[in-house]
Amino acid sequence: MAGRVIIIGAGLAGLTAAVAARTEGAEVLIVDRGPIGLGTNSALANGVMSGPSDRYGAEDYIRDTLRAGCGLNCAARVRLTAREAPSAFRVLRSVGIPMRERGAQRTVVSPDPSVIPGVTLMRRLSDHVRGLDGVHALPGFCVTELLRRDGRACGIRGFTRRGEPLQIEAPAVILAAGGAGALWRRHDNQRRIMGQGYALAAQAGLELLDMEFVQFYPLVLAEPGLPALIVYPPFAREARLTGASGEDILAKHGLADVNDAIVKKRDRFSALLFEEAQAGGVFLDLRGVPAAAWDAHPLAIFRRLRFPFRERPAAVAPAAHFMMGGVRAAETGETDLAGLFACGEILWGLQGANRLGGNALTECVVSGALAGRFAAERALAMPPAPSCGQKAQPAARAEGAGTAVQYREILRGLREAA
């Protein structure tokens, strides 16, 4: 098990961690309950990443992040992200991710505007990871517990998609399992995102911070029969938000720039639209949008849906979107449990009470790169240790653990690399 890093979660944070860990020379195994890459929330993202640039300084980014988070952010984490973001963005470009920089944001560009940018991002990154020797993936694997020995993480236990119990040992484990949005009846997350990483962390004795801060996205389709798809910015100038009686909601509340409200005031904008929805409904009216706009992102995505958007308004409402709270970790990504690292949405500190638009993916690439690098250093520096076996201290006892399938047998049978 020496030199091995296990990554729980195959979204942007997990795959970024895999690239970093492999670059340092570690053997990497990625496990996920769903498909690698495209089965994660990262694939549903608009592909926007906030961060410092030549025209948007680090202090500007820090100010906007703290302001959006109502000052409840971990200031050290915000400064760390500002410092590390530019290099993390360069890594994405180096592996073939098409990105456009404009002011405070980098945006992933899909060659086909009807394809969600997150899909393009995760396809390209998954393809890159798939080509790395020493990186393996186990999709359809459900982790049920973290193994511990002598006060440090030493592996995982769980079940394969065929229901086989499996114990895998490693001197470094990275939690990159995402948030818990699918716990809400109305959400825009993948259905599997139900807080498994938080549960594993809590069972291992880690403190979860600020879990009361849940971000709702303001504009999500609410038409019966349609998926709960985000209405991605930029918001078309000719589009209108109306109430049940046809009144202009934006004018009613003095919102001159809806895109600014989506990015910087998402919490208050969602609360406002929720109240309007309770009073009779909120509708997105795209009938005045020019035909040419339907050939460009983001409206080109709507062409795939069976709804007459050009003929009548569509119901929209806020939906659970992102968890601001999570696990505390050092700058290296290591948690209070030695050998256990965390990255992505499960990590506490950057967002405060409300996330700045574009900071989700930024958090993934920055914290993923750091966790992967330092987890690899930890794994490579550790001498061979006795098996976790019966001496391990699992956070929760799993039935059938004694009949665990050997890791090497499973690895030889893998047909899908991340």
Name the predicted role of every residue range.
Residues L138-P139, T144-A153, F159, H297-G349:
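A glycine-rich dinucleotide-binding beta-alpha-beta segment and adjacent secondary-structure elements
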Residues G34-L66, C70, V231:
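Conserved N-terminal glycine-rich FAD pyrophosphate-binding loop of Rossmann-like flavoproteins
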Residues R4-I30:
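N-terminal Rossmann-like FAD-binding beta1-loop-alpha1 element of flavoenzymes
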Residues A172-G225, L361-F374:
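Glycine-rich loop(s) and the adjacent beta-strand/alpha-helix scaffold that form part
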Residues L38, A88-P165, E169-A172, A176-A177, ...:
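Conserved redox-cofactor binding core of oxidoreductases
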Residues G11-L12, P35, A180-G181:
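Residue-level detector of alpha-helix initiation sites
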Residues M1-G3, A20, E24, P35-G37, ...:
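Glycine- and aromatic-enriched mobile tails/lids
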Residues L200, L206-P308, R312, F374, ...:
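An anion/pyrophosphate-binding glycine-rich loop and adjacent beta-alpha core
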